[in-house]
């Protein structure tokens, strides 16, 4: 992903270095726009959003709703719209306290996705309904 501040870019690059030996994890530190963005979203099974700073609690929430709109389960920072993961079983709050903790969580998350595909699909359907354009318009017109 793209980063807004130099310290975020440094943290992103550190994550990429820490996980460089995992060939099935890819980090893209660039802006993805238009069709390139859509193709990237369609090419993955799940989306990880490791926004670690408190300032991102709602600032970058759009990425979470994009993941929901593309029916993608998520590993999201606990700071990122936490009420969404509390209401819908569409992913987990990511634990980046250490490489072993994250590795264990990632393995468990993948196993859970495989074993509970229908649960994730049902919850992604419900989240899409709750955050639909139709419901947005209805709430605006009230």
Segment roles from a protein language model:
Residues 1-2:
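Short beta-strand segments
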Residues 9-38, 43:
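Nucleotide-activated donor-binding/catalytic signature segment of Leloir-type glycosyltransferases, i.e.
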Residues 27, 74, 91-93:
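Conserved beta-strand scaffold positions in the cores of enzyme catalytic domains, especially
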Residues 40-43, 105-109:
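CheY-like receiver
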Residues 45, 71-73:
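A short alpha->beta transition loop at the rim of the catalytic pocket in nucleotide-sugar-dependent
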């Amino acid at each position: 992903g793209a980063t807004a501040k130099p310290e975020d870019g440094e943290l992103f690059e550190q994550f990429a270095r820490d996980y460089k030996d995992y060939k099935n994890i890819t980090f893209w530190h660039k802006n993805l726009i238009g069709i390139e963005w859509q193709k990237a979203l369609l090419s993955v099974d799940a989306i990880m959003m490791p926004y670690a700073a408190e300032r991102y609690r709602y600032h970058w929430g759009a990425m979470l709703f994009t993941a929901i709109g593309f029916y993608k389960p998520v590993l999201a920072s606990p700071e990122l719209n936490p009420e969404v993961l509390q209401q819908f079983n569409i992913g987990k709050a990511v634990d980046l306290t250490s490489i072993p903790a994250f590795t264990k969580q990632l393995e468990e998350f993948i196993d859970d996705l495989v074993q509970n595909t229908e649960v994730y699909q049902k919850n992604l359907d419900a989240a899409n309904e709750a955050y639909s354009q139709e419901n947005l318009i209805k709430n605006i017109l009230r």
